[in-house]
């Protein structure tokens, strides 16, 4: 009979699984990533996988949550550096920081394509509170920072979604993408923030 994993082994295996899932999320995508791929890379059997996660989808949701925390941390850091600036500048810094962090993590396609499909594997309440679309998450962070808008929330959210989806075209636009994105974010915040 196989020996159970020690707590230290469990932690190490769990981290290896998450690391492999991160790799596949940004390269292959969730749908094309098999349980065999994840377990082989982590050095465990398929049956052992279920001692760590009840499904492949829940593993990917956990790394989505980790990435969400990284984006939130980056935005919170940008808030610290924008103390004393007006709300339009603060909002622009927050939105731009969220976009650049998402790009730096390489997770735009994962968030746009895979995360909405994964959200169906969790209860609706939990999906709303944690696994938000990135645009909704950015919008919620602006509200949390007490940024007030001149337009209805639906219009603000749509503007954030349009800006967010532009990240997908970064390679087509080339090296001027981020300076142009910054201009668009600042312009949108000038119009939308009270």
Segments and roles (model prediction):
Residues 62, 76-104:
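Hydrophobic alpha-helical connector segments
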Residues 111-120:
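Short linear capping/connector segments at secondary-structure termini
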Residues 1-12:
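N-terminal intrinsically disordered/low-complexity leader segments
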Residues 143-188:
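Hydrophobic/aromatic-rich alpha-helical bundle segments in the mid-to-C-terminal region
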Residues 30-40:
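Ser/Thr-centered, proline-biased regulatory motifs
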Residues 72, 76, 119-157, 179:
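Amphipathic alpha-helical packing segments from all-alpha helical-bundle domains
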Residues 43-53:
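Short hydrophobic/aromatic patch on the recognition helix
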Residues 16-23, 27, 41, 58-78, ...:
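Alpha-helical structural segments
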């Amino acid at each position: 009979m196989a020996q159970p994993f020690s707590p230290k082994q469990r932690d190490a295996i769990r981290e290896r699984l998450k690391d492999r899932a991160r790799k596949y999320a940004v390269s292959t995508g969730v749908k094309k990533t098999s349980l065999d791929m994840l377990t082989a890379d982590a050095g465990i059997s398929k049956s052992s996988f279920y001692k760590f996660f009840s499904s492949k989808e829940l593993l990917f949701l956990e790394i989505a949550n980790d990435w969400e925390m990284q984006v939130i941390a980056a935005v919170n850091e940008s808030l610290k550096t924008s103390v004393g600036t007006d709300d339009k500048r603060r909002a622009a810094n927050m939105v731009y920081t969220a976009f650049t962090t998402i790009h730096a993590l390489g997770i735009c396609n994962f968030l746009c394509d895979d995360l909405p499909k994964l959200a169906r594997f969790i209860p609706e309440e939990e999906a709303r509170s944690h696994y938000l679309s990135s645009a909704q998450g950015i919008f919620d962070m602006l509200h949390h920072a007490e940024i007030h808008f001149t337009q209805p929330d639906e219009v603000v959210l749509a503007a954030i979604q349009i800006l967010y989806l532009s990240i997908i075209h970064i390679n087509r636009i080339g090296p001027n993408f981020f300076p142009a994105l910054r201009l668009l974010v600042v312009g949108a915040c000038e119009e939308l923030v009270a």
